[in-house]
């Protein structure tokens, strides 16, 4: 069965796993999902991730992070979707919660946070907001 929006599926699996306090969540792997997981790890929203290959299929296993029994990720939501892509120039990349959260942006220079995209001077597709 094909999936219409694999990034939304990744975000939903993370959100659902954190609501039931799971330690890890496993999703089908892709280059963009690995890049998103790397940004989440660099920003401190997850403990880590590992790519596990079984034959011709690879799974991305994400270790979720909790603080005082509560999930570190309070809000994670998809912005750009297949039916309505959201592109922003370098000057109009949005801030999430006045800079307390991050927007994950895919640019010609790779997947990065909104702050890094502004510092690099590139715009791109706003994938999701994380706070």
UniProtKB/Swiss-Prot annotation:
Biological process, per Gene Ontology: translation
Gene Ontology MF: a single term: rRNA binding
SUPFAM superfamilies associated with the record: Ribosomal protein S8
Short name of any one Pfam family annotated for the protein: Ribosomal_S8
Stretches assigned to coiled coil: none
GO cellular component: a single term: ribosome
Keywords from the named record: Ribonucleoprotein, Ribosomal protein, RNA-binding, rRNA-binding
NCBIfam families: PRK00136.1
Subunit annotation: Part of the 30S ribosomal subunit. Contacts proteins S5 and S12.
Annotated function: One of the primary rRNA binding proteins, it binds directly to 16S rRNA central domain where it helps coordinate assembly of the platform of the 30S subunit.
Similarity section: Belongs to the universal ribosomal protein uS8 family.
Name of protein: Small ribosomal subunit protein uS8
Gene designation: rpsH
């Amino acid at each position: 069965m094909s999936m219409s929006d694999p990034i939304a599926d990744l975000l939903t699996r993370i959100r659902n796993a954190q609501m039931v306090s799971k330690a890890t969540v496993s999703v089908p792997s892709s280059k963009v999902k690995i890049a998103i997981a790397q940004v989440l790890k660099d920003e401190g929203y997850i403990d880590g991730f590992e790519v596990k290959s079984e034959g011709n299929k690879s799974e991305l296993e994400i270790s979720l992070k909790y603080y005082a029994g509560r999930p570190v990720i309070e809000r994670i939501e998809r912005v750009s979707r297949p039916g309505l892509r959201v592109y922003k120039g370098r000057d109009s990349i949005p801030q999430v919660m006045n800079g307390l959260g991050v927007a994950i942006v895919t640019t010609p220079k790779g997947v990065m946070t909104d702050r890094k995209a502004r510092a690099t001077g590139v715009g791109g597709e706003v994938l999701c907001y994380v706070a």
